[in-house]
Design a protein with these regions (language model features):
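HAD-like aspartate-dependent phosphatase fold
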Residues: 1-134
């Protein structure tokens, strides 16, 4: 599979929706994101958060082992003016607000890698109870 640019929403997708607070991580969210990065896909955090709330989300992801290529832009430190479109150019958008809702990270992985399972080391990094109940 070729390398993809994947725009990923935060609230309701990476974590349970608890905005403005940060919800609990969605089941397999960080395991899947790490595996996608290992597959050399470019991940962009694509969220409505801004200011301090955005920084908290970025830091939360970093603390959970996921560093995004860019945040709310196509490239790191991309200068945006009010005339620029805020739309992120991506091959794939992962968001809880898409048609049909968010299918879950296990289904995201199966859609992208139908013949593969998540890498075992990612699955074993947390016990089943911790993955299910945080």
């Amino acid at each position: 599979m070729r390398s993809l640019i994947i725009a990923v929403d935060f609230d309701g997708t990476v974590v349970e929706d608890a905005y403005p607070r940060i919800g609990k991580p969605q089941l397999f969210a960080f395991e899947t994101l790490k595996a996608l990065k290992q597959e050399r896909h470019r991940l962009i955090l694509w969220t409505c958060r801004k200011g301090q709330s955005l920084q908290e989300a970025v830091e939360f992801c970093r603390e959970n082992g996921v560093e995004f290529f860019a945040v709310n832009s196509n490239f790191p430190d991309e200068p945006l003016t009010p005339e620029d479109s805020p739309k992120i150019v991506a091959d794939l958008y992962i968001d809880d607000r898409n048609l049909g809702g968010f299918p879950g990270w296990d289904q995201v992985w199966k859609m992208l890698k139908p013949d593969d399972e998540l890498p075992e080391e990612e699955m074993r990094s947390k016990g089943i109870f911790q993955r299910l109940f945080g």
